[in-house]
């Protein structure tokens, strides 16, 4: 946590303001600035970042065909001016070690992973299962899974994380493609998808569906 924090930001996911007065240390890994720093770390430690990342996603989802949507990756690159600004801003604070374009290319590909709701739910199962995937492989330690679940609970929905906790009561993570994955530790993982996003960047109907799920079943962490 020297390069990325673990606190909620309370600001929009692509904000530069907080990053400036906190000297280039993103509040958490789920806002864009934090994800870009994590991408930089992976570029530093992986021999073939894009290939290794797609292999990891296939491993945790249990689907050998899960891959990048190259049209989406190109679209992200063509319109990713705010992310380019964030990466250069992070670089100015010494919190990006690799070439900016290399980091951005990897990040845009991460944003373009394409999968079904079932594959997304399966990919998140190890967070619900003390770090063990559906195929029985230990991906994380139980302690690491607990900490990531805590991060998802407090930071997984940008500046709407409190609202999601209040209404749904599960650790979860939203994506700009309209997907949401959530977990009930030691019980299950679940995913929703609807592309209509609210003003906070989260799937409106996905959040509603998960609220109905936990309300009607009484299954939440609270």
Show the residue positions of the predicted features.
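Active-site-adjacent helix/loop patches that line small-molecule binding or acyl-intermediate pockets
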Residues: 1-110
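Short glycine-rich loop/turn motifs
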Residues: 85-87, 120, 177-180
